UniProtKB/Swiss-Prot annotation:
GO biological process annotation, one example: maturation of SSU-rRNA from tricistronic rRNA transcript (SSU-rRNA, 5.8S rRNA, LSU-rRNA)
Major location (coarse): nucleus
Name of the protein described by the UniProt record: rRNA biogenesis protein RRP36
GO cellular component term, pick one: nucleolus
Chain segments annotated as coiled-coil in the UniProt record: 165-204
Gene responsible for this protein: RRP36
InterPro entries (alphabetical): RRP36
Length: 278
C-alpha cells in the first residue's frame, strides 16, 4: 500500500509569518512539516523561539546564588562585628575593678608631670599667681613691696578695732554663738600678730639701714677707713634693745617673765640629765 505524503497547503493570500506561527504553535506535528519552509522562514522562526525562551526563562541560578551569598556575607559581617562588640563589652566589664590600675593609650607619650585624680595639679596652683612675685622674674624686693603696700596696715588696724568693738558690745555678743565669738577672737589675734611681725621687721630693717648710714658718714669724714659690718648676734642685740625701748611697761614685764621661765626650764633639763658625782 503506497503512502502519499501530503505537504501542508496554505493560501497565497496568507503571509509567510502567519503560516510560520501556525507551524510553531502546532507542537504535535512531525519534523516533516518544517521541510516545506524556506531558510529565511526557519531563521526567523529560530529568532522567535529564542526571544520566547528568553522572556519565559526563570532568573539564573548564578544571580540568585550571588544574591544569597551577598546576603549571607552581610549577615555574617554584621554577626562578626556584633560578636566583636559583645566580646569587647564583656572584656571591659570583666576587667573593671576597684583595685585595677588606670588605663592609658599607648599612642600618646606619657607626660613628665602625671596628673593624679584627687591631687592638685600644677596648672591649678599656677593659675592665679601674681607675676610680680614670680621666681622667674628674680627675688622680690621686700623693702620696696613693704613701702608700696604700707597703706594696708591702716586697713588692718581699722579691722581689728571694729572686731574688738563687736566683742565688747554685749547686745551683739548675745546674738552670736560661742563658736562665732571664738572665731572672731582668733581673727583678732592673728591680725594683731601679723601687724606686730611687720612692725618688728620694719624696725630691724631701719636699725640696719641706720647703722650703714652712720658707717658711710664716718668714712666720708675720715674717722673710719673701712665700714664695720654687724654680725648676726650683734644685730639681734640691737633689735632687741630697740624693741624694749618702744614697748610699754606691761609688755616688758610679760617678755621678761617669758624669758625667765624659759631659762628655768633649760636649767631643770640640765639638772635632770647631769650624772651624779661619786
Amino acid at each position: 500500500m503506497s503512502t502519499h505524503r501530503f505537504k501542508p497547503s496554505y493560501d497565497e493570500s496568507e503571509s509567510e509569518d502567519d503560516y510560520l506561527g501556525s507551524v510553531l504553535d502546532n507542537k504535535d506535528e512531525s519534523d516533516d512539516d518544517f521541510s516545506s519552509l524556506s531558510f529565511g522562514a526557519l531563521n526567523s522562526a529560530q529568532k522567535k523561539l529564542r526571544e520566547q525562551s528568553e522572556t519565559q526563562r526563570p532568573p539564573s541560578r548564578k544571580s540568585s546564588k550571588n544574591q544569597e551569598s551577598d546576603d549571607s556575607d552581610s549577615d555574617s559581617d554584621d554577626q562578626f562585628f556584633e560578636d566583636k562588640k559583645s566580646k569587647k563589652t564583656k572584656d571591659k566589664k570583666s576587667k573593671r575593678s576597684k583595685h585595677a590600675p588606670a588605663e592609658a593609650s599607648f599612642k600618646r607619650p606619657v607626660p613628665k608631670i602625671r596628673e593624679i585624680p584627687g591631687l592638685k595639679s600644677a596648672k591649678d596652683s599656677t593659675l592665679y599667681t601674681d607675676i610680680r612675685f614670680d621666681a622667674a622674674y628674680g627675688k622680690a624686693d621686700l623693702n620696696r613691696v613693704r613701702k608700696d603696700y604700707a597703706f594696708l596696715d591702716e586697713l588692718r588696724q581699722k579691722e581689728i578695732a571694729e572686731m574688738k568693738a563687736v566683742l565688747k558690745n554685749d547686745k551683739l555678743r548675745r546674738k552670736m554663738s560661742q563658736r562665732e565669738i571664738e572665731d572672731l577672737e582668733l581673727q583678732v589675734k592673728s591680725l594683731q600678730s601679723r601687724l606686730d611681725t611687720l612692725k618688728n621687721r620694719d624696725l630691724s630693717t631701719k636699725i640696719i639701714s641706720d647703722h650703714k648710714k652712720q658707717q658711710m658718714e664716718k668714712m666720708k669724714k675720715g674717722e673710719q677707713v673701712n665700714p664695720y659690718y654687724l654680725k648676726k648676734s650683734e644685730q639681734r642685740k640691737m633689735i632687741q634693745k630697740a624693741k624694749f625701748e618702744t614697748m610699754k611697761a606691761s609688755q616688758r614685764e610679760k617678755v621678761m617673765e617669758r624669758k625667765r621661765k624659759r631659762k628655768l626650764g633649760r636649767e631643770f633639763r640640765q639638772l635632770e640629765f647631769r650624772e651624779p658625782q661619786r
